[in-house]
Amino acid sequence: MEGDLAALGGCASSASDDDGYGDEGGRIVCGRCDRPANACLCDALPDEPIRLERGCGVIVLQHPNERKRKLATVPVLTKALGSCDVLVGRKFRAGQEPVLDEAYRSAREGGADVFVLYPGPGARDLAREVAAVPRRPWTLVAIDGTWQQAKEMFKTNEDVLLPAGVPSARRVSLRPPEGGIRMPLRTEPERGCMTTMEAVASALGVLSDAPDLEPRILAPLAKLYGVQKGFSPSLKERAERGIDYKGSRRQRLVAGGGDGGGDDDE
């Protein structure tokens, strides 16, 4: 979609190649945030991607189908956070992903922690875990996909993510955000679910000593959410009305105007 480029806030006012814009499928696309020009996020992105403290990082295991979604939040996350590696696939094996292997090598040697962010029975509260262990390097592992895809990926890769004999690799969960869902780009299956970017930012807010880290990471997501409300009547309705979690999953999806894992488009 073409928009008024002069009104985009930190972006150029023409569509020439020199201005950082390209043409993708007939739409003008920003060369920095890779979003359509009239949905540009650049004025909410940090000048340089945020770097975490030495020895710390984020690994996102992304379902292949998630790359196709226009409102996937991980591409926005990687624009804001420099210390983030994205591995695409359904099944991951030891010895095939260097960044994953290095994180678990350090954990086996007892010099670092691995926190696998996946809620449910058996997950420990991240804030309590951080308070109980000495400060040392860590890696946060998150799964990116629809709720069903994430469930299947965790089950398939559980032996790799939580290997026997590595107590410093553990499954953790976040405390529900105050006020419930903050930016429901999708119709969540139950209260407390968040987008991948929200979950990672919230976890980093617990793991890091920097009090402004979480809001800095979430700024471009808030911009994306605000822009999309203007394009999507169903998203605007969900934001204004909230989501009723009392009905069946099907009733919630119909009421929310979503498919439980799809995206509203701009």
Go through the PLM ranges and name each one.
Residues D43, R69-A80:
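Histidine-anchored nucleotide/phosphate-binding helix
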Residues V133, T139, W147-E266:
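C-terminal folded domains that constitute the principal catalytic or ligand-binding module
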Residues A37-C40:
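Cys/His-rich microdomains that often coordinate metals
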Residues A44-G57:
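Short cysteine/histidine-rich metal-coordination sites, predominantly Zn2+-binding motifs
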